[in-house]
């Protein structure tokens, strides 16, 4: 490995002789860096893990019920008929009666064969182990059940509609249908919460030629057994510093690097402390070399030494090498910013919401992707059966759904660990971002979705360790360009 890096540095030094004078890099800073509270930040001294998750579900149902009712009243207002019968509004799930079309608002709950159970994990001494389950669904036995619930009880949802629409635990919706038999409800239509507001997208400024670009990377997954990842990281550093690209003007437009989680490959059950420290030291070296040239935000991810429950708190500064101490001064937050996961911010008026990707990875396990789209450009991973095509379109669909649901982590706390909030649910959106970034995905992809007249740019950021891919997001046009580093 050392020989490879030495050869790489020799080749780079030859290129340096031909480089023109360095350009001034575009400056990109969070518009509200010093004057806002982070909804995902947890005060260490005030944390209390003794509360029940009941409060989260109650807050979620109460908040979304008002939003969903507004939209349901527009679609199924008084006088709305179905097959000649008047459709009634039911205030409670248990008020649903037979042979009468009606609609009701409630929270979805999925009972699935392979969904993890905390009590079983504790009994079997597997609690806290990595979740290797690819799907919670019972594809062959058909034992899975989807229910609508509220404070009064539950009703089983049936019908063809639930096979073509994602129904995920924790999502609050309005359901139109009719009781098929006692305790079951035939679903005919679904209604999502009323559209959210969105800040106006900033207009071009004549005195400012460009808003610049931010580089997005996730899944560096540095470890002690994969030297190729370290070499890729070295090339990434040289690229961002403009040393392996003749288009220096283009590189100078990249004003910030956002590392979206999984910087190190850390599993507490299989990686010892010394191996972790080696990975963190290499990561620190990368930061030490690049920070004089470009500002960096660092989010934690599933593999990182951070909280295992959402929202993940920022890396602790003690994890980094002493060479970075000067950057942890509050005044240097513009240069090195250790942030939460999820992370919301605004760059030059562009609102961005970023997640490390565990939320979408978990939601994927609730849904069996359809095979109706034909062959995808992204082939199925080896070892996966042909009836489970987890392609980029499937994942973009689910990312879009989280915007429709206005909840970026609906499966928390059922199958996604989260902090037991008592008075709020920070994963519930109050406004839509301009850009929604989901990192550590198998594939790259983008999509512009329009909901209620508002446009949201969705970006799927792939793992760098397996794809060598970084994304350059233009804050002026919201175009996403890929750069691939092969070795």
UniProtKB/Swiss-Prot annotation:
Any single biological process term in GO: lagging strand elongation
Residues recorded with modification N-acetylmethionine: 1
Gene Ontology MF terms in the entry: DNA binding; DNA-directed DNA polymerase activity
Reaction(s) catalysed (UniProt annotation): DNA(n) + a 2'-deoxyribonucleoside 5'-triphosphate = DNA(n+1) + diphosphate
Pfam families (alphabetical): DNA_pol_D_N, DNA_pol_E_B
EC number: 2.7.7.7
Phosphoserine modification, residue list: 20
Key words of the record: Acetylation, DNA replication, DNA-directed DNA polymerase, Nucleotidyltransferase, Nucleus, Phosphoprotein, Transferase
Keyword Nucleotidyltransferase: yes
Signal sequence region: none
A GO cellular component annotation in the UniProt record: zeta DNA polymerase complex
Domain of life: Eukaryota
Subunit: DNA polymerase delta is a heterotrimer of POL3, POL32 and HYS2.
PANTHER family given in the database record: DNA POLYMERASE DELTA SUBUNIT 2
Family per record: Belongs to the DNA polymerase delta/II small subunit family.
UniProt function note: DNA polymerase delta (DNA polymerase III) participates in chromosomal DNA replication. It is required during synthesis of the leading and lagging DNA strands at the replication fork and binds at/or near replication origins and moves along DNA with the replication fork. It has 3'-5' proofreading exonuclease activity that correct errors arising during DNA replication. It is also involved in DNA synthesis during DNA repair.
Miscellaneous information on this protein: Present with 626 molecules/cell in log phase SD medium.
Protein name per the record: DNA polymerase delta small subunit
Lineage: Eukaryota, Fungi, Dikarya, Ascomycota, Saccharomycotina
Gene this protein is translated from: POL31
């Amino acid at each position: 490995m050392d020989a490879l890096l030495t050869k790489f540095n020799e080749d780079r030094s030859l290129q340096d002789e031909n480089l023109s004078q360095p350009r001034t890099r575009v400056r990109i800073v969070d518009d509200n860096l010093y004057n806002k509270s982070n909804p995902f930040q947890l005060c260490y001294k005030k944390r209390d893990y003794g509360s029940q998750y009941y409060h989260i579900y109650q807050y979620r149902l109460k908040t979304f019920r008002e939003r969903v009712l507004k939209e349901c009243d527009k679609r199924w207002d008084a006088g709305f008929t179905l097959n000649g019968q008047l459709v009634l509004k039911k205030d409670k799930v248990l008020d649903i009666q037979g042979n009468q079309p009606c609609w009701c608002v409630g929270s979805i709950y999925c009972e699935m064969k392979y969904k993890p159970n905390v009590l079983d994990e504790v009994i079997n001494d597997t609690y806290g182990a990595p979740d290797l389950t690819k799907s919670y669904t019972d594809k062959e036995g058909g034992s899975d059940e989807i229910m609508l619930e509220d404070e009064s009880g539950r009703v089983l949802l049936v019908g063809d509609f639930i096979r073509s629409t994602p129904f995920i635990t924790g999502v609050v919706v309005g359901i139109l249908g009719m009781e098929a038999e006692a305790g079951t409800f035939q679903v005919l239509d679904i209604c999502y919460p009323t559209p959210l507001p969105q800040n106006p997208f900033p207009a071009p400024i004549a005195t400012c030629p460009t808003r610049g670009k931010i580089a997005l990377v996730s899944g560096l997954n540095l470890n002690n057994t994969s030297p190729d990842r370290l070499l890729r990281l070295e090339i990434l550093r040289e690229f961002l510093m403009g040393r392996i690209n003749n288009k220096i003007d283009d590189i100078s437009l990249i004003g910030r690097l956002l590392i979206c989680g999984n910087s190190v490959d850390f599993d507490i059950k299989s990686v010892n402390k010394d191996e972790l420290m080696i990975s963190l030291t290499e990561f620190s070296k990368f930061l030490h070399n690049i920070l004089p040239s470009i500002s960096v935000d660092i989010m934690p991810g599933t593999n990182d030494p951070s909280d295992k429950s959402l929202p993940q708190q920022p890396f602790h500064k003690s994890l980094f090498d002493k060479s970075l101490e000067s950057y942890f001064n509050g005044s240097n937050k513009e240069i090195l910013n250790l942030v939460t996961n999820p992370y919301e911010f605004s760059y030059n008026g562009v609102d961005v919401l970023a997640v490390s990707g565990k939320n979408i990875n978990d939601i994927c396990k609730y849904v069996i992707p359809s095979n109706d789209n034909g062959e995808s450009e992204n082939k199925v991973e080896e070892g996966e059966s042909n009836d489970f095509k987890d392609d980029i379109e499937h994942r973009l669909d689910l990312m879009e759904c989280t915007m429709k649901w206005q909840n970026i982590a609906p499966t928390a706390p059922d199958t996604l660990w989260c902090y037991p909030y008592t008075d709020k649910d920070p994963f519930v959106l109050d406004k839509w971002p301009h850009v929604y970034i989901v990192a550590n995905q198998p594939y790259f992809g983008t999509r512009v979705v329009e909901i209620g007249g508002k446009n949201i740019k969705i970006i799927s950021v792939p793992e760098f360790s397996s794809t060598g891919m970084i994304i350059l997001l233009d804050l002026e046009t919201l175009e996403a360009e890929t750069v691939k580093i092969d070795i």
